[in-house]
C-alpha cells in the first residue's frame, strides 16, 4: 500500500513532478530538482520530514540545510515555514547532541542548534512549536532550567492542554524535587490524551517512588510495561522495588528484571550499575568491574558516572588494591552530586590508609554534613580529631564521641577514645569513661581489661594525687601484661617497661626514693637507651643538692642522644641555679641551633629569663642595660608569635616593661595573665612588686600574703623578704620584724636576712628613744635591741656576703647604732624619771580613789539606816491609826437608831432626801456628810440662792444621783495652828458671781470644836511603801480621783482619807445600808465626837424653827434641779478630776495639819447648817 506522494510544480508550466514516498530518489537528486524548479520552502520541509521518517537522516539534514538557502520564499506565510525549517533542523541537532558521547562533537552540535534557534527567534519568536523546541533545548543544557520553565509556562497560558508543555513542566518540577507538582502535570497530560506513550507512566512511577507510594509506583511501572514491554526504565524501577524488599524471592525477581532490561538494552548505564551492585554483594568482583566500567563509558550523565566509579572503587577496595580504589573513589567524588556521599566515605578511608588525616577529616566532614547523626562517621572523626594538636578539633572530637556513646552506650572503643581525649582537660571524667569501658569489657564482652587501660587509669590517679589508687592500678597492669606476654611477648614487655617507669615516678611522689632509684636502674639494665630514666635519676640527685651527680646523669642521657633537648635544658637549669648565667645561656642556645628544636618554647623562655636576670645586677652602663632589655623583650615576643597563649612569655614582657619604667602598662599585663590563670606564682609576686613601686603598700602586703598561702606550703624566705620590705616601706616595723624573724627561723645563716633584721631593730629602737612618752620598759628593750643590731652590723661588716650587699653599708649602720647607744643613757634616765613620776601619780590617784570609796560606803550605810528608821515609824503610825478608826466605827454604829438604818437602807439608790418630820437625827451631820457639800456649792453658783436652801437642795440632789460618785466641795486649808474665827460660825456665806478663772468660795465652818482638834488623824499620810515618794503619793490620790470636779487643792487629802476609811470599814457599811451606795458614811473621829454631834443638833433645832417647812419645800425642788445639773456637768466633773490629780501633793501634810483641816471642815459644815 502506497504511503503517499508529493507533487513538485515545474517552473513556468502547469506540470508537476510526483514523487512517491515509497520510492524516494537520492537526496542529492531531489535537491537538484528542487533547486532547478525554485520549489517553495514548505515542499522542501515535507520532503525532509519524509526522509527523516525513513531514517535517512543524512538526506534529511542535506535537504533542510539546502532549503535554508535555496528554498523559494515568494509565497504567503513563508515566515512560518522558514521558522519551521530552522526549528526542525535545530531539534535534530539537539537530539544528536543528547546521544553524542564525544564532548567536542556534542559541543559543536549544541552550538549549531543554538544558532538555528537564534535565527528562528528573529522570524517568529512566540510560536508555540518554536518555544517548545527551544525549551527542550534548554532542558538538555541543564543550567537553563528556569528559562525552559518560563517558555513552557508561556505555552500553557496560551494552550492549557498542550501535552509537550505539560510533560516539560513535569520534568522541571521533578528536578526541583516538587514531586507532587510533577505528578499533577503527568496526570493532566494523561487526562488530556489517555493514549500517551509509556514514558508518561514511567514518570508517574518515579513520582510515586519519591512520594513513598510504592504500591502505586509498582502499578505505574507495570502499566508502562503493558504499553511498552521494552521500556527499560520501567523494568529497572520494578527491579529496584523488588530488591529493596530484602527478601530472597524479591531479590531473585529483581535480578531477573535487571537481566531482562540488560537483554533489551545492554548499554543502558542504569541497568549496568544496578547489576554491578548486585554482583558486588555476590563477591563476583570481576563482573562488578566489567559492568561498572561499561556503564561509565556509555553515559555522559555525571551522576551515572559517579555511581559507576564508586562501584569500581569499592570492588578494588575490598580486594585491597588501595591505589586503584583511591583513584576511582576520587574520580567518583568529582562526578558525584552533593547528596551522594558514599565515595567521600571510601576516599576518607583511603586517606587514613595513606596517613593524610587532614584530607581524611575533610571527607568525613562532608559525609557528616549530609548525615549529621551517622554513627560510623562521628566515631571516625572523633578518633581523627582526638590525635590532633588543635584544641578546637579536640573539642569537636569530644563532642562527636559523646554523641556516639549516647547512641551506642556499649561501644568500648568510643569510650576509650573519649577517655583519651579527656585525659588532658578533665581527669575526673576521663576516669569515669575508663571505668565505663572497663565495666563493659568485664560484664558484656566477658574479656579481661587490657594492661594499657589499667596503666592509663593509674597515671590519671597519680595526676590527681591518689597515690594509693595509682599504685594499685600500676601493679594490676604489670600483672596483666605478664599474663598477656605469652601471646605477644615483645608488645607486652614494652607495656611492662612503661608501667614500671610510671611506678618508679609514683615512688618518687611517695618519697620512697630508694625504691624509685632501684626501678629506674632495673629498667636501664634491660633497656640502656631509656633516656627518661637517666633524666629522672639526675633530677632526684639535683633535688638532694648533689648537682655534680645530677650533671653526670644528664650527660649519660646525652651520650645516648646527643641532641636531646630535655637533657640540655636540665643541665642549663643547673647552671642557672648556681647563678652561672653564661654557661646556662650557652646550653639553651645550643638547643635553639638544632633544626628540630629551633622554635623550642622552653629554651627561648629560659634565654629571655637570662637576659632579664642581668637587669637585676647593679650596673652603671645604661646602654648595656637597655640592650639586655631589648633582647629579653624580643625573645618573649618571638615566643608569643609562636604560641599566642603562652602566659610565661606575657609575664616576661610585663617584667621588662616594669624595668623600663612603664609600671602602669606592666601592671595591666600582669593583671591579664592573672585573669587567664591564677596558678603561676611569679605573676602574683610581680603584681605585688608593682604595687610596692606605686606605693600601694597595703595591696602589696595582701598580695604577698596570698601568694605565700596559695603556693608555698613551707615558708619561702624570698617571698617573706619581699613581704618584710613592703611592711618596712609602709612603716609597719613591728610586723616587719616578726616576718623577718620567721624567715630567720627558716634560714638562720642568711646574711641578707640578718642585715634586714638589724636594720629593723635599729629603726624601732630609734623611734622608741626619740619618743619622749616611751616608758622605761620600752626604752630598756629598745636599748637591748639596739645593742643586738650593733653586734649584727659589726659581724656583717666583717664576714658578710659581698655579692648580696655592700659591707661598707653594714659598717656605716654599725657606727650609727654606736652613736645611738652613746645617747641611750640620757633616754634611760629620762624614762626612769618619768616612770617614777608616773608611779607616784598612780599611787596618789589610788589613795584618793580609796578615800572616795570609803566615803561612799559610809553614806550608803547611813542612808540605809535612815530608811529603816522611817519605815519603822510609818508602820507604828499606821497601826495606831487603824486602831482608832476601828474604835470610831464601833461607836458610830451604836449611836444609829433603827429608824435611821431604815432610812439609809431605803435611800440607797435614789432619793435619800431627809426632813425634820422624819426624826430628830435626820439633820445629823458627820464627817461623811461633807460629800454633800459639793452640790450645795454648785447650787449657789448656778442660782444665786441662800446657802441654806442650797445646802439642802445639794444634799437631796446628791443622794438622788446615788452611788459613791458624789461631788465634794473643796475647802480652803486653814493656816497651820489656827482654830478658826467666831465670824465663821455666825456669818452666813455670801453668794458670788462666778469668774472665768477665780471663784469665790463660801466661808467654811468648823464642825469640830477646838477641844477635839488634834485627835482626828488623816489616813493620807499613812503609806504602805518604805518611802514617801511621789509615785506612792500619786497612787493614793488616784483612789478618790473622780470625786471632786471643781474643788480646790486642799480637798484632795480629805477625799483620800475618807476613801481609805471606807475601804477599812466595808463590812460595817454593808450591814448598815441596803445598797450601800447612797448611805452616808461615818467620819473618823475620836471618842468625843458624840458630844460635838449633840451640840450641833441642838443648835440647828433652835435656829431653824419655823423655817423648816419652807426649807423643806425648797430642798425638794432644789434636789430635782441638782439632779439634772449634776448629770449635765458630768463631763466637767471628769475634767475636774483630771485637774484634781495635780493637787495630790497636798497629801504630804503632817498629822497635825490633817487634824486642823478636819476640824475646820467640820465647823464649815455646821455653819452651813445653822444658816439653814
Swiss-Prot record:
Keyword entries, A-Z: Nucleus, Repeat, TPR repeat, Transcription, Transcription regulation
Subcellular location, principal: nucleus
Oligomer status and interactors: Component of the PAF1 complex, which at least consists of cdc73, paf1, leo1, ctr9 and rtf1. The PAF1 complex interacts with PHF5A.
Transmembrane stretches, start-end: none
TPR repeat spans: 41-75, 129-162, 163-196, 198-231, 235-268, 306-339, 341-374, 412-444, 451-484, 497-530, 531-564, 566-598, 613-646, 648-680, 681-714, 717-750
Organism expressing this protein natively: Xenopus tropicalis
Basic and acidic residues bias (residue ranges): 1032-1042, 1160-1172
Lineage start: Eukaryota, Metazoa, Chordata, Craniata, Vertebrata
Alphabetized Pfam families for the sequence: TPR_10, TPR_16, TPR_19, TPR_8
Free-text function comment from the UniProt entry: Component of the PAF1 complex (PAF1C) which has multiple functions during transcription by RNA polymerase II. PAF1C associates with RNA polymerase II, is involved in transcriptional elongation and in histone modifications including methylation on histone H3 'Lys-4' (H3K4me3).
Membrane recorded as keyword: no
Ranges of Polar residues composition bias in the record: 1068-1093, 1105-1134, 1149-1159
Protein known as: RNA polymerase-associated protein CTR9 homolog
Cellular location(s): Nucleus speckle
UniProt feature, compositional bias: Basic residues: 965-975, 991-1001
A Gene Ontology BP annotation from the UniProt entry: negative regulation of myeloid cell differentiation
Listed Acidic residues bias regions: 921-932
Highest taxon above the source species: Eukaryota
CDD domains: UDM1_RNF168_RNF169-like
Gene Ontology annotations for the cellular component aspect, listed alphabetically: Cdc73/Paf1 complex; euchromatin; nuclear speck
Signal peptide range: none
Amino acid at each position: 500500500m502506497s504511503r503517499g506522494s508529493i507533487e513538485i510544480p515545474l517552473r513556468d508550466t502547469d506540470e508537476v513532478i510526483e514523487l512517491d514516498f515509497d520510492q524516494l530518489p537520492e537526496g542529492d537528486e531531489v535537491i537538484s530538482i528542487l533547486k532547478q524548479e525554485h520549489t517553495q520552502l514548505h515542499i522542501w520541509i515535507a520532503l525532509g520530514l519524509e526522509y527523516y521518517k525513513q531514517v535517512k537522516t543524512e538526506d534529511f539534514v542535506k535537504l533542510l540545510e539546502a532549503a535554508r538557502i535555496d528554498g523559494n520564499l515568494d509565497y504567503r506565510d513563508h515566515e512560518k515555514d522558514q521558522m519551521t525549517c530552522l526549528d526542525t533542523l535545530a531539534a535534530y541537532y539537539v537530539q544528536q547532541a543528547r546521544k553524542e558521547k564525544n564532548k567536542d562533537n556534542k559541543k559543536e552540535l549544541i552550538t549549531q542548534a543554538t544558532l538555528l534557534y537564534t535565527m528562528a527567534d528573529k522570524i517568529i519568536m512566540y510560536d508555540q512549536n518554536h518555544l517548545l523546541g527551544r525549551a527542550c533545548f534548554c532542558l538538555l543544557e541543564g543550567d537553563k532550567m528556569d528559562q525552559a520553565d518560563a517558555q513552557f509556562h508561556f505555552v500553557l497560558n496560551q494552550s492549557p492542554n498542550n501535552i509537550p508543555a505539560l510533560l516539560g513542566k513535569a520534568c522541571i518540577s521533578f528536578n526541583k524535587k516538587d514531586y507532587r507538582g510533577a505528578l499533577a502535570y503527568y496526570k493532566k497530560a494523561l487526562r488530556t490524551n489517555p493514549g500517551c506513550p509509556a514514558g508518561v507512566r514511567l514518570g508517574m512511577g518515579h513520582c510515586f517512588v519519591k512520594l513513598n507510594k510504592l504500591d502505586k509506583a509498582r502499578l505505574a511501572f507495570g502499566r508502562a510495561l503493558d504499553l511498552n514491554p521494552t521500556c527499560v526504565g520501567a523494568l529497572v524501577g520494578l527491579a529496584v522495588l523488588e530488591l529493596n524488599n530484602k527478601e530472597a524471592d524479591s531479590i531473585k525477581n529483581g535480578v531477573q528484571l535487571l537481566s531482562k532490561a540488560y537483554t533489551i538494552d545492554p548499554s543502558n548505564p542504569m541497568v549496568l550499575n544496578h547489576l554491578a551492585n548486585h554482583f558486588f554483594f555476590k563477591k563476583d568482583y570481576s563482573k562488578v568491574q566489567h559492568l561498572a566500567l561499561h556503564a561509565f563509558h556509555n553515559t555522559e550523565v555525571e551522576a551515572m558516572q559517579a555511581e559507576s566509579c564508586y562501584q569500581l572503587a569499592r570492588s578494588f577496595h575490598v580486594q585491597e588494591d588501595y591505589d586503584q580504589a583511591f583513584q576511582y573513589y576520587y574520580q567518583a567524588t568529582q562526578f558525584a552530586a552533593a547528596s551522594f556521599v558514599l565515595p567521600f566515605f571510601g576516599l576518607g578511608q583511603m586517606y587514613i590508609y595513606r596517613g593524610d588525616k587532614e584530607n581524611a577529616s575533610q571527607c568525613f566532614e562532608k559525609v557528616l554534613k549530609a548525615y549529621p547523626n551517622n554513627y560510623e562517621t562521628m566515631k571516625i572523626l572523633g578518633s581523627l580529631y582526638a590525635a590532633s594538636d588543635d584544641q578546637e578539633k579536640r573539642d569537636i572530637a569530644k563532642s562527636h564521641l559523646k554523641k556516639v556513646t549516647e547512641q551506642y552506650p556499649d561501644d568500648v572503643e568510643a569510650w576509650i577514645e573519649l577517655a583519651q581525649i579527656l585525659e588532658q582537660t578533665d581527669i575526673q571524667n576521663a576516669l569515669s569513661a575508663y571505668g565505663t569501658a572497663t565495666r563493659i569489657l568485664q560484664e558484656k564482652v566477658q574479656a579481661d581489661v587490657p594492661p594499657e587501660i589499667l596503666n592509663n587509669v593509674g597515671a590519671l590517679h597519680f595526676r590527681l594525687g591518689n597515690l594509693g589508687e595509682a599504685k594499685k592500678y600500676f601493679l594490676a597492669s604489670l600483672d596483666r601484661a605478664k599474663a598477656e606476654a605469652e601471646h605477644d611477648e615483645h608488645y607486652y614487655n614494652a607495656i611492662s617497661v612503661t608501667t614500671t617507669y610510671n611506678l618508679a615516678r609514683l615512688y618518687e611522689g611517695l618519697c620512697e626514693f630508694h625504691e624509685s632509684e632501684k626501678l629506674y636502674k632495673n629498667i636501664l639494665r634491660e633497656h640502656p637507651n631509656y633516656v627518661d630514666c637517666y633524666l629522672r635519676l639526675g633530677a632526684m640527685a639535683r633535688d638532694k643538692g648533689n648537682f655534680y651527680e645530677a650533671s653526670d646523669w644528664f650527660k649519660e642521657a646525652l651520650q645516648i642522644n646527643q641532641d636531646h633537648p630535655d637533657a640540655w635544658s636540665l643541665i642549663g637549669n643547673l647552671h642557672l641555679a648556681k647563678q652561672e648565667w653564661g654557661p646556662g645561656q650557652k646550653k639553651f642556645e645550643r638547643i635553639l641551633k638544632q633544626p628540630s628544636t629551633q622554635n623550642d618554647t622552653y629554651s627561648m623562655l629560659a634565654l629571655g629569663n637570662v637576659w632579664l636576670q642581668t637587669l637585676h645586677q647593679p650596673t652603671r652602663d645604661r646602654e648595656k642595660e637597655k640592650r639586655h632589655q631589648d633582647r629579653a623583650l624580643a625573645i618573649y615576643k618571638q615566643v608569643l608569635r609562636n604560641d599566642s597563649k603562652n602566659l610565661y612569655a606575657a609575664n616576661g614582657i610585663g617584667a621588662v616593661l616594669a624595668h623600663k619604667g612603664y609600671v602602669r602598662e606592666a601592671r595591666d599585663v600582669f593583671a591579664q595573665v592573672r585573669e587567664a590563670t591564677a596558678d603561676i606564682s611569679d605573676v602574683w609576686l610581680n603584681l605585688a612588686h608593682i604595687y610596692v613601686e606605686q606605693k600601694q603598700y597595703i595591696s602589696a602586703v595582701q598580695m604577698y600574703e596570698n601568694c605565700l598561702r596559695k603556693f608555698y606550703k613551707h615558708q619561702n624566705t624570698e617571698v617573706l623578704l619581699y613581704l618584710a620590705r613592703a611592711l618596712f616601706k609602709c612603716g609597719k616595723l613591728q610586723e616587719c620584724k616578726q616576718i623577718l624573724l620567721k624567715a630567720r627561723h627558716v634560714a638562720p645563716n642568711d646574711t641578707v636576712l640578718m642585715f634586714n633584721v638589724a636594720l629593723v631593730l635599729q629603726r624601732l629602737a630609734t623611734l622608741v628613744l626619740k619618743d619622749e612618752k616611751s616608758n622605761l620598759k620600752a626604752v630598756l628593750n629598745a636599748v637591748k635591741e639596739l645593742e643586738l643590731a650593733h653586734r649584727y652590723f659589726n659581724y656583717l661588716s666583717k664576714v658578710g656576703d659581698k655579692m648580696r650587699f655592700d659591707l661598707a653599708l653594714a659598717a656605716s649602720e654599725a657606727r650609727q647604732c654606736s652613736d645611738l647607744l652613746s645617747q641611750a643613757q640620757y633616754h634611760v634616765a629620762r624614762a626612769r624619771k618619768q616612770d617614777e613620776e608616773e608611779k607616784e601619780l598612780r599611787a596618789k590617784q589610788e589613795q584618793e580613789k580609796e578615800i572616795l570609796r570609803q566615803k561612799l560606803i559610809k553614806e550608803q550605810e547611813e542612808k540605809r539606816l535612815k530608811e529603816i528608821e522611817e519605815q519603822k515609824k510609818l508602820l507604828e503610825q499606821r497601826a495606831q491609826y487603824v486602831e482608832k478608826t476601828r474604835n470610831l466605827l464601833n461607836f458610830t454604829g451604836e449611836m444609829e437608831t433603827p429608824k435611821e438604818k431604815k432610812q439609809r437602807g431605803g435611800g440607797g439608790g435614789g432619793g435619800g432626801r431627809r426632813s425634820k418630820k422624819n426624826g430628830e437625827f435626820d439633820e445629823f451631820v458627820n464627817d461623811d456628810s461633807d460629800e454633800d457639800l459639793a452640790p450645795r456649792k454648785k447650787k449657789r453658783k448656778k442660782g444665786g440662792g441662800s446657802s441654806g436652801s442650797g445646802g439642802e437642795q445639794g444634799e437631796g440632789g446628791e443622794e438622788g444621783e446615788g452611788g459613791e460618785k458624789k461631788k465634794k466641795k473643796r475647802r480652803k486649808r486653814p493656816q497651820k495652828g489656827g482654830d478658826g474665827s467666831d465670824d465663821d460660825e455666825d456669818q452666813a456665806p455670801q453668794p458670788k458671781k462666778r469668774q472665768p478663772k477665780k471663784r469665790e468660795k463660801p466661808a467654811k465652818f468648823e464642825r469640830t470644836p477646838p477641844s477635839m482638834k488634834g485627835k482626828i488623824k488623816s489616813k493620807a499620810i499613812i503609806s504602805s511603801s518604805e518611802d514617801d515618794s511621789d509615785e506612792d503619793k500619786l497612787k493614793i490620790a488616784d483612789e478618790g480621783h473622780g470625786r471632786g470636779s471643781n474643788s480646790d487643792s486642799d480637798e484632795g487629802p480629805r477625799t483620800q482619807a475618807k476613801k481609805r476609811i471606807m475601804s477599812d470599814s466595808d463590812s460595817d457599811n454593808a450591814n448598815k445600808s441596803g445598797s450601800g451606795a447612797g448611805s452616808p458614811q461615818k467620819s473618823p473621829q475620836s471618842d468625843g465626837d458624840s458630844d460635838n454631834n449633840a451640840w450641833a443638833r441642838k443648835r440647828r433645832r433652835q435656829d431653824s424653827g419655823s423655817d423648816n417647812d419652807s426649807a423643806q419645800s425648797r430642798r425638794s425642788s432644789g434636789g430635782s434641779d441638782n439632779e439634772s445639773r449634776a448629770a449635765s456637768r458630768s463631763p466637767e466633773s471628769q475634767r475636774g478630776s483630771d485637774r484634781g490629780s495635780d493637787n495630790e501633793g497636798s497629801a504630804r501634810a503632817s498629822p497635825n495639819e490633817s487634824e486642823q483641816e478636819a476640824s475646820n471642815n467640820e465647823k464649815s459644815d455646821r455653819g452651813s447648817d445653822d444658816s439653814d
